[in-house]
Amino acid sequence: MRLSSVFAFVFDIDGTLVDSNELHVDSWDRAFQRFGKQFPRDQLRAQIGKGSDQYLPEFLTPEEIKRFGKELDEYRSELFRKEYLPKVRPFPKVHELFQRIHDDNKRVVLASSGKKADTKYYIDLLKVGNLIDGYVSGDDADSSKPAPDVFGASLEKLGKISPAKAVTVGDTRFDIEAAKNAGLKTIAFLCGGTPESVLREAGAIAIYRDPADFLVHYEELMASGAER
């Protein structure tokens, strides 16, 4: 894939543009405990990046999901929105990165497995509403990551462009898997906490520390067209 031919970027949000992954772990931990379940934090963290439809089956039996899965998910979502969302902070240089991409006449769509209300909150937090071409949330897809639905819907937002003309940017192996399932390549960031070895094994075509690091190397990467 020659990155110099890329027409659009599809960005994940949590752990990629905003520092929220540990806050999600905290909220899931508290939600499970409220319903009498407790799991090691490293196990909870390892599944961050999935939407709740994919996350809950990793920890609950089908019978448990039927009995209280919806109630737990709603409790967790409300808990995160009330107590944790105000604590989320952008990673450095996100606005500058999006401005650079915009100045390069390339398009951007945000794609999250999270709730639509949270996604809209992040757009305001990042102050990038005038620099993006749209967004897709988990509410817009039948199945969340690692299913391809969210990224497929993102391509629709871009006018049904070929996957060869777009690249995703994410922070977890689930982003990379979902992108692959949609025919897309992925640039990965380390700021979400996933080890570099895991991202490389999953198939990331390039890995950067965070949005600021990507911004530093953006011109070089796009000019060379090379994978890193």
Set out the residue ranges of the language-model regions.
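N-terminal helical cap/lid subdomain that shapes the substrate entry/recognition surface
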Residues: 2-95, 100-106
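Short beta->alpha linker loops
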Residues: 23, 47, 51, 89-93, ...
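Substrate-recognition/cap helix-loop segment adjacent to the acidic, metal-dependent catalytic center
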Residues: 26-29, 33-35, 55-66, 87, ...
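Conserved short alpha-helix immediately C-terminal to the canonical SAM/SAH-binding motif I
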Residues: 17, 24, 118-119, 150, ...
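Conserved Lys-Pro-Asp/Glu-containing loop-to-beta segment of HAD-superfamily phosphomonoesterases
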Residues: 8, 145-176
